[in-house]
Amino acid sequence: MAYIEGNTGKWEYVIGLEIHAQISSKSKLFSGSSTIFAANPNSQVSYIDAAMPGMLPVLNKHCVHQAIKTGLGLKAKINKYSVFDRKNYFYADLPQGYQISQFYYPIVQNGTMEIPTSTGDLKTIRINRLHLEQDAGKSMHDQSPHYSFIDLNRAGIGLMEIVTEPDISSPEEAAEFVKKLRNLLRYIGSCDGDMEKGSMRCDANISVRRSGEPLGTRCEIKNINSIRNIIKAIEFEAKRQVDLLESGEEIIQETRLFNADSGETRTMRLKEEALDYRYFPDPDLLPLVISDELINELKANLPELPDQKIEKYTKEFSLSKYDAEVIVADESVAEYFEKAANECNPKMLTNWLTSELFGQLNKASIGINECKITPSNFAKLVKLIENDTISGKIAKTVFEIMFETGKAPDKIIEEKGLVQVSDNNVLNTVIDEVIAENPESVEGYRSGKDKLFGFFVGQVMKKTDGKANPTLVNQLLKEKLSS
């Protein structure tokens, strides 16, 4: 467990998260308006989104399915009966004067997610609920020095709000939870998880306490937009609360904003309670009733999820848990790996994938989907190394050409004349030449200077332009030098 070091001793973090995940859907939660990102302001607004009188909301079935699939991925209970409520508050970018949400009867409850801790153990984080709600519009303050403008393109887009219990005990655990949740949503296809574009936003509820004491007063940090900022915001806010408590002051329950430039949080507004929002069932929407048949159908069509892939890679491919987690962290990488792993040694493939390929992708600032090397050609390269057709050194040269051109490795080897020399007669001839040319070094090696062995290997490789089979060279050299 992580602690905050105060002037009067240690304090514990108590953290709960609320994740707002924009549902991957072509249309909004209650209207047919488009959800395309970065469209011209107010170009994707229906009468419902603009809260024009007389227009009734119609629930988007696809958004409901996405929420159910996410709930199944979180090992949660799917409520067969849920209700939409009106959350009443006034804000300029909320034209209805209320947000349609689910307060009393959410669609999903009681899920769990396991995250790795600093000790290497797994920790279970309880998911209190997942509910459906509409997003608000966007206030724009940088268009004029005198006026603010409203863009309603985002208004009405479907969100899943995923709320944890206060089970998180450090900023790093919070970051791990968000990373793992984001990966799960991407595998399911229910949210793209792009925090930079705002399609996934994180609110953190933070309090501090002495070990064994009751929960303290919490403050909520709104709309944290990156994994790195989650850690920074929680660290700063917890330290701020400790400083106040140690100086004899009280924590005021409030909503705060995190400034990424200064690394500080500041007051946004006093924290509201549920009563302030005057929740009541939306009279324009019927209760949502979900059948067992629908739940079972969606469950049967779920893709293989990250934890399942990690288990498969460690068992079927004998990868370490760490390597499996690195590959599974990106669905596209996992898909690429599986296509190649069926054609070559998975462990050797993993080494080349996570070192050489990742290095080149980072250098070129591209994703694996843009890589010119097909999984099949990558597997061919690994097999050529495995069967000693080429050495590791030659393989790196071949790989670089493959990355630039997309050519098959065997074609490159043929064009460049890079086939590894594994003929004993040819290698013995070269070794005899090296020994004859270096009598003093031979005498030195035979008198106990073992480090000279590397010199002989280097000379053989030089004479063969690096094409000699290094394993065979070592074996033949030892035989020649010891005779």
Curated annotation (Swiss-Prot):
SMART domains: GatB_Yqey. It comes from the Bacteria. Transmembrane segments: none annotated. Disulfide bonds: none annotated. It catalyses: L-glutamyl-tRNA(Gln) + L-glutamine + ATP + H2O = L-glutaminyl-tRNA(Gln) + L-glutamate + ADP + phosphate + H(+); L-aspartyl-tRNA(Asn) + L-glutamine + ATP + H2O = L-asparaginyl-tRNA(Asn) + L-glutamate + ADP + phosphate + 2 H(+). Its EC number is 6.3.5.-. Keywords: ATP-binding, Ligase, Nucleotide-binding, Protein biosynthesis. Pfam families: GatB_N, GatB_Yqey. GO terms for molecular function: asparaginyl-tRNA synthase (glutamine-hydrolyzing) activity; ATP binding; glutaminyl-tRNA synthase (glutamine-hydrolyzing) activity. Belongs to the GatB/GatE family. GatB subfamily. PANTHER family: GLUTAMYL-TRNA GLN AMIDOTRANSFERASE SUBUNIT B MITOCHONDRIAL AND PROKARYOTIC PET112-RELATED, GLUTAMYL-TRNA(GLN) AMIDOTRANSFERASE SUBUNIT B, MITOCHONDRIAL. Heterotrimer of A, B and C subunits. NCBIfam families: gatB, PRK05477.1-2, PRK05477.1-4, PRK05477.1-5. This is Aspartyl/glutamyl-tRNA(Asn/Gln) amidotransferase subunit B. The gene is gatB.
